[in-house]
Amino acid sequence: MPDEPTGSADPLTSTEEAGGAGEPNAPAPPRRLRMLLSVAVVVLTLDIVTKVVAVQLLPPGQPVSIIGDTVTWTLVRNSGAAFSMATGYTWVLTLIATGVVVGIFWMGRRLVSPWWALGLGMILGGAMGNLVDRFFRAPGPLRGHVVDFLSVGWWPVFNVADPSVVGGAILLVILSIFGFDFDTVGRRHADGDTVGRRKADG
């Protein structure tokens, strides 16, 4: 009798191989972490450089016109949060920002979504930019005042870090509303599955 075909394979092995073959382009988490860090470095660098230039060139508290009185360079020292909110709680804001930075690094280990990498990178870069001021500017560590220098209309004076943090947060809210998770590629189904691909942990 002819030998029986030996092409059959263990079902579990076949399933795993098929799953692996179906995800040849699934981005590995380290790749997205690198993207997150790259965005953060760009934001942080822009924030630090523009603050140094502002401190060197702008007279404190005296607006320098860019577009009439609507858009001006105005150098101020801010003890509060983004856009001069919560002044007087400098050390609390410093601790919160530090916690945000730690949390983003923790999420970055499992990050798969490129859009989440962009949003988290914007928040990380902005948070670190203002933390540099909190730790290294007067009146002292944890109490340092943040340098703000751009005024637009009635909006409080701000710096590069502020719109980066707010813009990144808005992006993450939009992604969450539309069902995009940080550790998936694609959208969630109503039952919790994803339309895209979920990268296995580890």
Curated annotation (Swiss-Prot):
Pfam families: Peptidase_A8 (PF01252). GO terms for cellular component: plasma membrane. The chain crosses the membrane at residues 35-55, 88-108, 112-132, 160-180. Residues 1-29 are annotated as: Disordered. It is a multi-pass membrane protein. It is found in: Cell membrane. Keywords: Aspartyl protease, Cell membrane, Hydrolase, Membrane, Protease, Transmembrane, Transmembrane helix. It catalyses: Release of signal peptides from bacterial membrane prolipoproteins. Hydrolyzes -Xaa-Yaa-Zaa-|-(S,diacylglyceryl)Cys-, in which Xaa is hydrophobic (preferably Leu), and Yaa (Ala or Ser) and Zaa (Gly or Ala) have small, neutral side chains. Its EC number is 3.4.23.36. The keyword Flavoprotein does not apply. One of its GO terms (molecular function) is aspartic-type endopeptidase activity. GO terms for biological process: protein modification process; proteolysis. Pathway: Protein modification; lipoprotein biosynthesis (signal peptide cleavage). The active site is at residues 148, 162. This protein specifically catalyzes the removal of signal peptides from prolipoproteins. Belongs to the peptidase A8 family. This is Lipoprotein signal peptidase. It comes from Mycobacterium tuberculosis (strain ATCC 25618 / H37Rv). The gene is lspA.
